[in-house]
Amino acid sequence: MALIKLARQLGLIDTIYVDGARPDPNNDPEESFNEDEVTEANSVPAKSKKSRKSKRLAMQPYSYVIAVDFEATCWEKQAPPEWREAEIIEFPAVLVNLKTGKIEAEFHQYILPFESPRLSAYCTELTGIQQKTVDSGMPLRTAIVMFNEWLRNEMRARNLTLPKMNKSNILGNCAFVTWTDWDFGICLAKECSRKGIRKPAYFNQWIDVRAIYRSWYKYRPCNFTDALSHVGLAFEGKAHSGIDDAKNLGALMCKMVRDGALFSITKDLTPYQQLNPRFVL
C-alpha cells in the first residue's frame, strides 16, 4: 500500500473515480500528501561514479599490457611487387602498468631487412628510420630471441602470466595489445612464415585496441591520432615511430581503463592451443 501511495504522489499512476465517489483527501490516508516520504524517496543515493569505476577496475582482468607497434618496409602509392614483402625494421614493446599508467619497461631494436635491404625514400620519410640505422640492425630471428629473454625477465620480476599460460588462471594478468590486427596477424606472421622463423606461440593472441575502442566509445576514428584526440589525448613524439606509437597506445589503454572499458583477447590464431610456460618463464 505504501508503494502505491508513493507512486500516486509522484504522479506515476492515477486512480479513476466514479462521479461523486472521490474521497476527501483530508480523510483518506492514501490520498494525503506526505512531503517527508517523497523527499526520502527522492534522496535515495544512486551508486556514485567513483564506486562504479572502482567496480569496473576490479573486473579488469589485466593489470599490465605489452603494447607493440612494428614499423616495416613500405613503398609509396603502389602495391609492392611480389618479391617486395613488408619486412619489420623496428621492433618496439612497452610494458604498461594499467593501475598506475606508468611504462615500467621497454624493448626496442632496429631490424636489418634482407628481402629489400634498401629503404625507399617514402619509408624513411614516413618512419624517420635512416638506412644506416637498419644497416646496423639485427636479423628478426635474433631480435625475437632477445625479446623472449626480455619478456621472461620482466614477467618473472612482476609475477605476470600471459593468457592460456596458466591453467588456474586462463586469462592471465598481462596481454599483448596492438592497434588493429596487422602487427601480429599479418606482418609478423607472414615474415616468420616466409623466412622459416619459429614464432613464439604467445604472439598468437592479442587485444586489438581499435576494435574495443570503436565498441566502447561508439566512434570510428579515421586514424590513431584521431582516436587519441577524440578522448582528449595528444600524440606525444613522432607519428610512425614504432616506439612512440607503442607508448601512445599504452597511454590510450590507460585512458580507456579509467573510462571504464573492459578488455579481453580479441584475436587468437590458435584457440585450442595452450602456451608452454617454460618457453616464456
UniProtKB/Swiss-Prot annotation:
AMP binds at residues 71-72, 240. Keywords: Cytoplasm, Exonuclease, Hydrolase, Magnesium, Metal-binding, Nuclease, Nucleus. Its cofactor is Mg(2+). Mg(2+) 1 binds at residues 69, 71, 245. Disruption phenotype: Results in normal embryogenesis but animals remain in the L1 larval stage until death 4 days later. Results in altered histone mRNA 3' processing and ultimately levels of histone protein expression. RNAi-mediated knockdown results in lack of adult flies since all die as pharate adults; the animals seems completely normal except for their abdomen, which is undifferentiated lacking the characteristic pigmentation and bristles. Residues 19-52 are annotated as: Disordered. GO terms for molecular function: 3'-5'-RNA exonuclease activity; double-stranded DNA 3'-5' DNA exonuclease activity; metal ion binding; nucleic acid binding; single-stranded DNA 3'-5' DNA exonuclease activity. The keyword Metal-binding applies. Mg(2+) 2 binds at residues 69, 183. Optimum temperature is 37 degrees Celsius. Its EC number is 3.1.15.-. The active site is at 71 (proton acceptor), 240 (proton acceptor). Its main location: cytoplasm. GO terms for cellular component: cytoplasm; nucleolus. Gene3D superfamilies: Ribonuclease H-like superfamily/Ribonuclease H. It is an enzyme of class 3 (hydrolase). Belongs to the ERI2 family. A broad-specificity exonuclease, capable of degrading both structure-specific DNA and RNA targets without sequence specificity in vitro. Requires two to five unpaired nucleotides in the 3' region for efficient binding and nuclease activity. Binds with higher affinity to RNA and DNA stem-loop substrates compared to single-stranded substrate. Binds to the 3'-end of histone mRNAs and degrades them, suggesting that it might play a role in histone mRNA decay after replication. This is 3'-5' exonuclease Snipper. It comes from Drosophila melanogaster (Fruit fly). The gene is Snp.
